[in-house]
């Protein structure tokens, strides 16, 4: 199986293909990965008002293996494809240094049981999932993705992998032989005080730092040389490569452990235990999360694989402010009376919007040199960002159009000769000589620089319990989700194109219809307990 490509619609209708792409070979695998964990933990009463907790965990996270050694890795230092157990073993080195200490304490400074100071620190190692290495099983000689011109010699399918096909190329997919296990350092400090019986307030700080996080790069990302000809750093595998020597190279998908992240948060909570029919729990969090990539997929997500720091920005899930309060109230009447057994509860959530990254759509062909090629295809991904134009202003009350909600202006500039470039354009396609940059360059917009709509939701329920006889109860529940039917918008369209009717426009809600927080929904329930 595979896919044909056509030069244009007319060629498609006539059935005149100009190329064929397919994966040849057996890509089924039998991957196994072992792990062993040991830990010890204990707590010590240092003083009557001071408890110390200590722990240590050690993980032996073995490198994945394939039953028949059907792994081939790309080795950057030699520009070669090397088979496991034939010049490379294992697929990446097992990390024996996964020592993960834990330390924490709880202290009652006034010895009255009303104040508690707690702090803790821990290191937590991550076991890589096996899809880190599944791409290694799709490399030659076990399987290969080939892009073939339509005019090639005829050959038997059984000989398709080894035959020299004019124009055939290889796109290796490999994990880094020097891959390191990711780990997270986590620490926190909390102060809790009982204000009065049943009511306590806690203030705290929480932080974490991720190291050796997984990133995927294209090691063979195209650049334009002095003659504006698209050029790759590695045009072909080394002539001394043990596998496919001298075969032309396309993109090299390389999974490595060079990412990191950070999270910092201040939070305050108030908790009231049930008394006199009332209980509630309220919390507010002020936080910021930063990383290079919030996804765990194998695909390349960096705009520029040679500039990892260019993708450092807010995490996809970052929400600067979040407030949640939940409560329950029982009417103060005897449960066996007509007004007794009534209970009301609610959950209210208020949250800042999540960030979104703008993309450059229709970046267009590279006009200099040959062959001409689309900028997105040259980098091996479709996450090129535009250049910064006029400042983006988000109105407190977004404008509603026939296409949806206009979250920010959708004016886009194409600076090429003959292109449209309206005044006030917020995004500029990175396709021409702009501000000293080459005709082909990476956009100056940062990752996750636009904040999307906030989230507000209130759920409410009414419960009536009626006692029947000595030990039977009929319970009626009326639950209302999104009580006020508040519209929680999704993210705005992020692909910048000249004349686009969707760029900057919100066309959907945050959650699909039927999910909590999408629209008002009610449900009734009747329960008989005996």
PLM segments and residue spans:
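Short, solvent-exposed micro-motifs at the edges of structured domains
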Residues: 32, 49, 61-63, 157, ...
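Acidic/polar loop-and-plug regions of large Gram-negative outer-membrane beta-barrel proteins
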Residues: 10, 14, 18-20, 142-176, ...
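Short, solvent-exposed turn/loop segments enriched in Gly/Ser/Thr/Pro and often Arg
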Residues: 56-69, 120-128, 206-209, 285-286
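Signature of Gram-negative outer-membrane beta-barrel scaffolds
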Residues: 1-110, 298-301
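A short, structured beta-strand-centered segment in the mid-to-C-terminal lobe
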Residues: 88-97, 151-154, 312-318, 326
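Short, glycine/charged-enriched secondary-structure capping and boundary segments
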Residues: 67-70, 132-135, 295-297, 492-493
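Surface-exposed patches in mature extracellular/periplasmic domains of secreted proteins
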Residues: 53, 114-118, 337
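Surface-exposed extracellular loop regions of Gram-negative outer-membrane beta-barrel proteins
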Residues: 62, 114-151, 211-217, 345-357
């Amino acid at each position: 199986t595979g896919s044909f490509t056509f030069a244009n619609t007319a060629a498609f209708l006539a059935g005149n293909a100009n190329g064929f792409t397919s994966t040849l070979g057996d890509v089924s695998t039998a991957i196994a990965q072992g792990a062993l964990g040991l830990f010890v933990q204990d707590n010590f009463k240092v003083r009557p008002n001071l408890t110390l907790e200590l722990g240590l965990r050690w993980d032996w996270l073995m490198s994945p293996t394939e039953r028949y050694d059907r792994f081939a890795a790309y080795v950057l230092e030699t520009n070669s494809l090397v088979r496991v157990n034939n010049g490379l073993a294992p697929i990446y080195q097992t990390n024996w240094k996964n020592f993960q200490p834990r330390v924490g304490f709880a202290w009652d400074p006034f010895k009255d049981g009303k104040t508690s100071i707690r702090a803790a620190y821990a290191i937590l190692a991550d076991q890589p999932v096996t899809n880190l290495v599944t791409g290694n099983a799709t490399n030659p000689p076990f399987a290969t993705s080939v892009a073939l011109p339509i005019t090639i010699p005829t050959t038997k399918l059984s000989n398709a992998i080894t035959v020299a096909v004019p124009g055939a190329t290889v796109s290796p997919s490999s994990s880094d032989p020097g891959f390191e296990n990711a780990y997270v350092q986590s620490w926190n400090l909390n102060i809790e005080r009982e204000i009065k019986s049943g009511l306590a307030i806690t203030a705290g700080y929480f932080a974490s730092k991720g190291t050796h996080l997984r990133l995927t790069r294209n090691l063979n990302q195209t650049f334009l040389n002095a003659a504006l000809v698209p050029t790759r750093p590695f045009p072909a595998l080394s002539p001394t490569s043990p596998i496919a020597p001298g075969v032309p190279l396309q993109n090299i998908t390389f999974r490595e452990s060079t990412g990191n992240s950070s999270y910092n948060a201040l939070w305050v909570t108030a908790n009231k235990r049930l008394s006199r029919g009332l209980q509630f729990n309220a919390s507010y969090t002020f936080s910021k999360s930063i990383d290079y990539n919030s996804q765990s997929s194998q695909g390349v997500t960096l705009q520029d694989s040679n500039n990892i720091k260019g993708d450092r920005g807010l995490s996809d899930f970052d929400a600067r402010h979040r407030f949640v309060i939940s409560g329950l109230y029982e009417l103060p009447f005897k449960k066996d009376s007509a007004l007794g057994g009534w209970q009301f509860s609610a959950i209210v959530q208020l949250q800042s919007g999540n960030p979104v990254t703008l993309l450059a759509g229709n970046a267009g062909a590279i006009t200099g040199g040959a062959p001409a090629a689309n900028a997105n295809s040259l980098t091996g991904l479709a996450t090129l960002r535009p250049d910064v134009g006029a400042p983006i202003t988000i109105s407190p009350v977004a404008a509603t159009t026939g296409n949806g909600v206009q979250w920010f202006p959708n004016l886009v500039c194409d600076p090429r000769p003959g292109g449209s470039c309206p005044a006030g354009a917020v995004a500029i396609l990175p396709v021409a000589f702009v501000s000293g940059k080459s005709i082909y360059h990476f956009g100056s917009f940062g990752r996750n620089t636009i904040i999307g709509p906030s989230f507000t939701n209130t759920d409410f329920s009414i419960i009536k319990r009626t006692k029947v006889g000595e030990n039977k109860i009929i319970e009626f529940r009326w639950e209302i989700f999104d009580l006020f039917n508040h519209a929680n918008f999704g993210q705005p369209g992020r692909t910048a194109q000249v004349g686009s009717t969707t760029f900057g426009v919100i066309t959907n809600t945050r959650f699909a219809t039927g999910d909590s927080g999408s629209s008002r929904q009610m449900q009734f329930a009747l329960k008989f307990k005996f």
